[in-house]
């Protein structure tokens, strides 16, 4: 099936209409629908196939799965629902009088190939993501500003951008690199000692934590959403504030043995 032009961005109805048209030109055993539960009913009515729905975000925030009634209806119609974390699955079953171990439901985590050749690590503390408070960027700035004066050989780096960027007070050795393609991000992580993901918002998954751990970073994360499910090796912040983050980073800086143990897992 050909890739449809980005009709979705101008008209969901037009996109759905074109999708149905293209699907009916062929015969498919299974149709996968990613994050578009509001399209399921019409697809099932007009295209004969089995349907697997992948949910990548909080279902309660999406058209078609916001209410318990909508979620029950969806569960009765599709053949399978795949969740990217247990957290997303739990949100789907919230307020439903059903066992979450439903036979139609399954969790499949995102994965990444672990880098076997870890480059020589440099004294870098890195933040990757949108440079906003939702991602905890202000917490990272405050923590490293207080930290770097005491650890002269270390530097902090931020990779990412933000359209409505707010000016944050940073340390002179905190370098903002801006947007980078994913391949370059992975290379940068491979050279970095410590990665920090201090998100305030409920991350459905948190790919950066997975990528950082796979590249041998000692990784610090918040406990929001599905973030704790992304890696077994990360240090989880009990309190999400600059003081706690500073202390966690500092412990990794001064305790080389602990840092290397976490990096090697």
Provide a role label for each language-model segment.
Residues 33-38, 55:
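Short His-centered aromatic/hydrophobic patch
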Residues 58-59, 87-88, 107-116, 163:
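Short beta-strand->alpha-helix junction loop in the catalytic core
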Residues 64, 71-72, 76-103:
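A short, active-site helix/loop in glycosyltransferases that binds the activated sugar's phosphate group
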Residues 82, 118-135, 141-145:
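Conserved donor-binding/catalytic core segment of Leloir-type glycosyltransferases
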Residues 165-183:
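Nucleotide-activated donor-binding/catalytic signature segment of Leloir-type glycosyltransferases, i.e.
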Residues 167, 224-236:
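Short acidic/histidine- and often glycine-rich active-site loop of Leloir-type glycosyltransferases
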Residues 190-204, 217:
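Acidic donor-binding loop of glycosyltransferase active sites
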Residues 234-243, 251-256:
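Conserved acidic donor-binding segment of nucleotide-sugar-dependent glycosyltransferases
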């Amino acid at each position: 099936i050909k890739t449809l032009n980005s009709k979705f961005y101008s008209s969901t109805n037009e996109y759905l209409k074109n999708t149905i048209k293209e699907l009916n030109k062929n015969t498919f055993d299974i149709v996968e629908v990613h994050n578009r539960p509001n399209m399921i009913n019409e697809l099932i009515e007009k295209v004969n196939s089995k349907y697997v729905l992948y949910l990548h975000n909080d279902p309660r925030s999406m058209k078609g799965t916001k209410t318990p009634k909508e979620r029950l209806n969806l569960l009765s119609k599709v053949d399978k629902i795949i969740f990217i974390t247990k957290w997303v699955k739990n949100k789907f079953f919230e307020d439903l009088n059903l066992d979450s171990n439903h036979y139609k439901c399954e969790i499949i985590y995102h994965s990444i190939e672990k880098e076997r050749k870890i480059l020589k690590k440099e004294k870098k503390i890195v933040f990757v993501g949108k440079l906003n408070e939702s991602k905890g960027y202000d917490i990272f700035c405050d923590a490293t500003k207080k930290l770097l004066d005491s650890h002269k050989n270390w530097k902090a780096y931020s990779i990412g951008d933000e359209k409505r960027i707010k000016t944050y007070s940073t340390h002179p050795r905190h370098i903002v690199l801006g947007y980078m393609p994913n391949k370059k991000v992975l290379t940068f992580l491979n050279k970095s000692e410590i990665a920090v993901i201090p998100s305030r918002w409920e991350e459905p998954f948190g790919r950066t934590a997975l990528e950082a751990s796979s590249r041998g970073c000692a990784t610090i994360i918040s406990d929001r959403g599905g973030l704790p499910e992304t890696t077994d090796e990360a240090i989880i912040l009990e309190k999400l504030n600059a003081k706690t983050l500073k202390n966690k980073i500092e412990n990794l800086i001064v305790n080389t043995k602990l840092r290397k143990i976490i990096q090697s897992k």
